[in-house]
Amino acid sequence: MIGAPFCIQNFEKEQRGGRIMAKTKTITIECPKCREAFEIKGYDTINASLDEALKEKLIKTELFRHTCPACGEDISAPYSLKYQDMEKEYMVILDMGDIDTAAMAEEVLEMFPNYRIRIVKDVMDLLEKIHIFESNLNDKIITYLDHKIYEDVSAKLRAENSPIALDKVLFGSFEFQKKKVVFGALNNAGKQIFIDTPFADYKALANSPRLAPCFKEKEGEYAIDKAWAEALA
């Protein structure tokens, strides 16, 4: 069950020597079952380079799981945060609708002018960005493939009159030895659907005369998502 964070207080943050040292913030959420409000500990920034344990809690989505102290309801309560990787020099901003992303991106670039910045609106999209960058792939190419695979598989399912409908397609893994990129398709049936794409397709897009310029970093282009991919199609 999803709870709604509605108040953030007691927030502290400091920046030292090219790194963000984050302290906790207190977030007040309301239990969707009993409507009791209670406080949880949250983070403004997760520095994956400095705190592997916290990174793993995020990857497993344990960071957003809480139990209502009043009724015992298990609650998923995502909140806005930043994810930093100092080695790969990028920052992903998770915006749950309560932050000024433009100002935040500007602040990040003032401290880290060489960073790639991405803005996402969903925890699954945040995790996808992390997996893409850890695989040393271009997230713009992968996001474009997400969209193309979604469209192609959805059209095939409709042609077969299948009751299965896709919700979204996300990057799963890059299998270097097998030269393939694996995608997973979230769907209304809860089935595990995986799609293998030859790495040659990724490289062909990277070298496409029409699309290659679109896959380069551009100032102010931080929301690399479905809408961005649709505009290229």
Residue ranges and their predicted role:
Residues 22-24, 224-233:
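Short acidic DE-rich linear segments
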Residues 2, 16-17, 183, 219:
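Feature targets compositionally biased, intrinsically disordered low-complexity regions
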Residues 3-20:
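Short, Lys/Arg-enriched N-terminal segments with co-localized hydrophobic residues
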Residues 17-97:
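N-terminal cysteine/histidine-rich coordination modules
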Residues 88-225:
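Long, contiguous alpha-helical scaffold regions
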